[in-house]
Swiss-Prot record:
<dbReference type="GO" id="GO:0042104">
    <property type="term" value="P:positive regulation of activated T cell proliferation"/>
</dbReference>
<dbReference type="GO" id="GO:0045862">
    <property type="term" value="P:positive regulation of proteolysis"/>
</dbReference>
<dbReference type="GO" id="GO:0005123">
    <property type="term" value="F:death receptor binding"/>
</dbReference>
<dbReference type="GO" id="GO:0045651">
    <property type="term" value="P:positive regulation of macrophage differentiation"/>
</dbReference>
<dbReference type="GO" id="GO:0006915">
    <property type="term" value="P:apoptotic process"/>
</dbReference>
<dbReference type="InterPro" id="IPR016729">
    <property type="entry name" value="FADD"/>
</dbReference>
<dbReference type="GO" id="GO:0043029">
    <property type="term" value="P:T cell homeostasis"/>
</dbReference>
<dbReference type="GO" id="GO:0001916">
    <property type="term" value="P:positive regulation of T cell mediated cytotoxicity"/>
</dbReference>
<dbReference type="GO" id="GO:0051607">
    <property type="term" value="P:defense response to virus"/>
</dbReference>
<feature type="modified residue" description="Phosphoserine">
    <location>
        <position position="191"/>
    </location>
</feature>
<dbReference type="GO" id="GO:0070236">
    <property type="term" value="P:negative regulation of activation-induced cell death of T cells"/>
</dbReference>
<dbReference type="GO" id="GO:2001238">
    <property type="term" value="P:positive regulation of extrinsic apoptotic signaling pathway"/>
</dbReference>
<keyword id="KW-0391">Immunity</keyword>
<dbReference type="GO" id="GO:0048535">
    <property type="term" value="P:lymph node development"/>
</dbReference>
<dbReference type="GO" id="GO:0045944">
    <property type="term" value="P:positive regulation of transcription by RNA polymerase II"/>
</dbReference>
<feature type="domain" description="DED">
    <location>
        <begin position="3"/>
        <end position="81"/>
    </location>
</feature>
<dbReference type="GO" id="GO:0005164">
    <property type="term" value="F:tumor necrosis factor receptor binding"/>
</dbReference>
Amino acid sequence: MDPFLVLLHSLSGSLSGNDLMELKFLCRERVSKRKLERVQSGLDLFTVLLEQNDLERGHTGLLRELLASLRRHDLLQRLDDFEAGTATAAPPGEADLQVAFDIVCDNVGRDWKRLARELKVSEAKMDGIEEKYPRSLSERVRESLKVWKNAEKKNASVAGLVKALRTCRLNLVADLVEEAQESVSKSENMSPVLRDSTVSSSETP
């Protein structure tokens, strides 16, 4: 899986509705009004920018500028990690889990303990997580997912996480995770075409 596409999907899943509206406003001079009207998610917008060669794997200046305008320092940190090589160093399956973790953290709040119990996180571990993050539900979710992943090691998978979500009746979140995997796969399948078109256009005299 292309780590850059994984990064874009991760960023998209963490954008609020207001964030998306602001991004569309910021891109109004780069993207036609017709295309912007079709944009329903951050990934939609990133895909358009990729197609127009305004955004490339090796040139993330525009992406950094957009995230800075949103004042989303957390997302800028993800971009920093990617550029530092953290994302590309991830083993197979790690990138898929990272996307799933981001979605779960953004959409599971007060039900985090129910999910943690289903993932076999001990009560003692949960108590420690609560003490460590007394004010952040999303960080509690992320920490509990890390505990599960560390315990499962190579057996930790998106499929296992989705199964736990559905057992907890968090079906909407499970659907979002599955849709994210499908969307990343489709984007990845399209990426060679984008690369070929980029090369062709650059070779045209």
